[in-house]
Structures are given as structure tokens and as C-alpha cells.
């Protein structure tokens, strides 16, 4: 995975409910695992912006509810600092669903804004995003 140019805070623990930013059919998902997280015994794994996570669909199309998908965190409420000194935060926590580990998006468009750090690490998501902040 490509490194990103920001000091990211991991603020989304396992069990967090997240909105879905794309048009894949899911509306709300639950975070169940963070890929590549190296933590301590008995400590919940946490995710930050542009992290690859595993989610379970909780609300959306009836045929998708309960299914497990890989996703990327594209927005986070907790503010983080960029290398130029600016701080950025969004009004909700959101993910974009993926078809595979390589970053192929399940949806065809992301109408809401995504972070620049996501576009750096996941170029296929940047292609379908309308707004990159």
C-alpha cells in the first residue's frame, strides 16, 4: 500500500457504524476488521483515513444486508493534520466499498467529497469521485 502524506489519527474502532459514500446499494455498514493493523493484545483495532477495512452491510438493498465487503475509509469526523500544517475534518464517517484488494470500486460514482489522502493511495477511487478535498 502506498504511504500517504499526512499524520493520520486512527479514530474508528471496530464496531463503528459508517455511511457508504458510493452508489453500490449499501447505505450503512459496520466496521468489523482493519487490514494490516498491528496492535496490542485485547485492544480494539482502529482505522483512519484511506485504510483498507472489512465491513458488514447493515442497511441498504435487501440482498446486500449481512454481506461482508472490503472498503476504504474516505471521510472521518476526527480532524487530522496534513504536512502543510492545515487540519481537515468532515461532518461524517464514510467508506467506499471495493470489489477486491486492488482498489476496484463496487460503485460507479462517489457524489460526496473524499479526502486527498484517499486519492493518493487509491487512484481508482479518485477516478469516480466528483470532489476531492
Swiss-Prot record:
GO molecular function: large ribosomal subunit rRNA binding; structural constituent of ribosome
Keywords: Ribonucleoprotein, Ribosomal protein, RNA-binding, rRNA-binding
GO biological process: translation
Record family assignment: Belongs to the universal ribosomal protein uL14 family.
HAMAP family reported in the protein's UniProt record: Ribosomal_uL14
PANTHER family in alphabetical order: 50S/60S RIBOSOMAL PROTEIN L14/L23, LARGE RIBOSOMAL SUBUNIT PROTEIN UL14
Name under which the protein is recorded: Large ribosomal subunit protein uL14
Species classification: Archaea, Nanobdellota, Candidatus Nanoarchaeia, Nanoarchaeales, Nanoarchaeaceae
